[in-house]
Design a protein with these regions (language model features):
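Extended, folded cores of ATP/NTP-driven motor/assembly subunits in large transport
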Residues: 1-431
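Structured core elements
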Residues: 71-73, 163, 361-363, 443-445, ...
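Short, solvent-exposed loop/turn segments at the edges of secondary structure
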Residues: 155-157, 355-357, 439, 449, ...
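Short, glycine-/Ser/Thr-/acidic-enriched flexible segments
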Residues: 367-369, 449-451, 460-461, 473-474
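Composition- and surface-driven signal marking solvent-exposed, interaction-prone regions
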Residues: 373-379, 480-482, 497-498
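N-terminal pre-Walker A segment at the start of P-loop NTPase domains
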Residues: 433-453
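P-loop NTPase nucleotide-binding module
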Residues: 459-494
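Conserved small/polar residues in nucleotide/adenosyl-binding loops
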Residues: 495-505
């Protein structure tokens, strides 16, 4: 017992061995392991390139650590064909809509013209043969419909979205505030007479899949698949590859694309510019990133700018006195900038205007460079028509592409300050389209603004009844007979016609 105690005492008094110094090779190996764990900050997969963290089933997207967004899809209304008073009312309501968003909410308006679906459109006007003696007439009528279809761009699937993003400490805090904003946005659309609906997580992922796969392809996904498979939502929407090494172009799967920004140079903007770009018969994606500036901060900034201009004006006047010429002769730029700054201050203080920072992005995709360049030149021509410039984002194609998807993230730091009325001039409404594919859909002519075919199955409308109104000799009877012939050739419905002036009797 005593021996064991002495042994333990001796062991306790022994000094610990000093730590061994690492060799140079070991230090290098440890540093390499740490570097690999940290990464180089670059995306090495297509999934890592897509800049959001998580998409939730209710439609909320966690974009960054504190940023959350939600998307609302909305339909078009007849703006360009409306009367002047109606257009003014729509424009003023749209200004109020934009003024609703404060500096804590970033807004993204997305206009997506998906790739051509001409085959589906032609299928909608195909008239099958029937067991009667009128198939030759059906063939002639079908050829006429195809010729009319070629005059428009019914093959393009057009969609409009508004995405709003906020910063919050947690998902719960973001969810409650996004719900309030969503309700207000839907009410504002209702005042405009616009049909709108919030998008679920599945719908947002399907939309992103369509952007990343412009050549088409089926989207197969369910949130219940994530846990068993260990995959993320990005695995179901990412293309086969991204390539951004060319500077002025990018490659996405089998497609080549290019993104540009709109440089606003015109002193006065026109509400037709956005509509003309969206009327191009090619796949194009236009995004407007809008961020409101705090009103008091905007006024302070403009006042400081006016003070600086006045100071420069005084210095120029002193220089004029010393040089012996009239002190009223100052550089024209000083006088111009001073007047514009004072006018802007007056608008913010007395005309219900706010200041916004706006970024306008235009993205095109095509099968080859030649087609892509032609699409870019077409959009560039429209911009020049309205005294603006469309410029390619050299060596920023990755950031521009990811800023062109509706998740509420803007990675392009090229912004233009605009007032509410100047921002609202990018009116997101043109004309309401009506193209219902179905076995009994009838042809009713072409849209007067877009030249797109009007194809309607009146049985599917809320009110299928119809009246033909017009002055004498304007073609009321011919219109009725044309619809009767169309219904006879397309459907198997029974037609009963009563004419009081014995023009026809069936």
């Amino acid at each position: 017992m005593q021996k064991e105690t002495r042994r333990n005492s001796a062991a306790g008094s022994a000094k610990p061995n000093p730590p061994r110094k690492l060799t140079r090779a070991e230090k290098k190996q440890i540093a390499e392991i740490i570097r690999q764990a940290k990464g180089d900050g670059k995306a090495h997969t297509a999934q890592q390139t897509i800049p959001y963290i998580q998409m939730y089933p209710d439609g909320i997207c966690k974009v960054t650590g504190r940023k959350y967004s939600k998307t609302v899809a909305f339909e078009d209304i007849n703006y360009q064909l409306a009367q002047a008073d109606d257009k003014t009312a729509i424009f003023e309501n749209w200004c109020d809509f934009l003024n609703y968003f404060d500096a804590s909410v970033s807004v993204q308006l997305s206009f997506i013209n998906q790739g051509t679906q001409r085959g589906e459109a032609e299928k909608a006007v195909n008239i099958p043969a029937q067991e009667d003696a009128f198939n030759s007439i059906r063939t002639e009528y079908r050829d006429m419909l195809k010729n009319q279809l070629a005059k428009g761009n019914n093959g393009l699937v057009k969609a409009k979205y508004i995405t709003f993003a906020i910063e919050a400490d947690s998902l719960g805090a973001a969810k409650s505030r996004l719900a309030r904003i969503e309700t207000d946005v839907l009410n504002n659309f209702k005042l405009l007479g616009v049909s709108a609906r919030p998008m679920t997580g599945y719908e947002r992922l399907k939309m992103l899949h369509g952007i990343f796969h412009p050549e088409g392809g089926q989207f197969a996904f369910d949130f219940s698949w994530l846990a068993p498979s260990g995959l993320s939502t990005k695995d179901f929407i990412a293309p086969s590859s991204f390539r951004f090494g060319e500077g002025r172009y990018f490659r996405m799967g089998k497609k080549i694309g290019a993104a540009s920004f709109l440089e606003i140079l015109a002193p006065e903007l026109n509400d037709r510019m956005l509509a003309d770009i969206l009327d191009l018969e090619t796949g194009v994606i236009v995004n407007l990133h809008i961020r409101s500036i705090d009103q008091s901060e905007a006024i302070k900034t403009i006042k400081r700018k006016i003070t600086d201009l006045d100071k420069m004006k005084i210095e120029e006047q002193k220089k004029a006195v010393r040089s012996g010429y009239d002190m009223d002769i100052i550089p024209s730029d000083l006088a111009t900038f001073g007047g514009e700054a004072k006018n802007l201050l007056e608008q913010l203080q007395s005309r219900n205007e706010r200041m916004f920072l706006v970024t306008v992005l235009v993205m095109n995709t095509a099968d080859n460079k030649q087609k892509l360049d032609n699409m870019f030149f077409a959009a560039q021509g429209i911009a020049q028509k309205y005294n603006c410039a469309l410029k390619r984002l050299d060596f920023q194609q990755e950031q521009a592409l990811m800023s062109s998807v509706p998740i509420g993230l803007n990675q392009i730091e090229i912004q233009r300050g605009l007032t509410t009325s100047s921002t609202a001039i990018f009116v997101p409404f043109t004309t309401q389209e009506l193209f219902q594919a179905g076995d009994e859909a009838l042809y009713y002519g072409l849209n007067a603004l877009s030249n797109n075919m009007i194809l309607v199955d009146r049985k599917k409308l809320k009110n299928p009844n119809g009246l033909i109104l017009g002055t004498p000799g304007s073609g009321k009877s011919f219109s009725a007979k044309r619809e009767i012939a169309n219904a006879f050739l397309v459907t198997v419905s029974y037609t009963h016609l009563r004419a009081h002036e014995t023009e026809a009797d069936l």
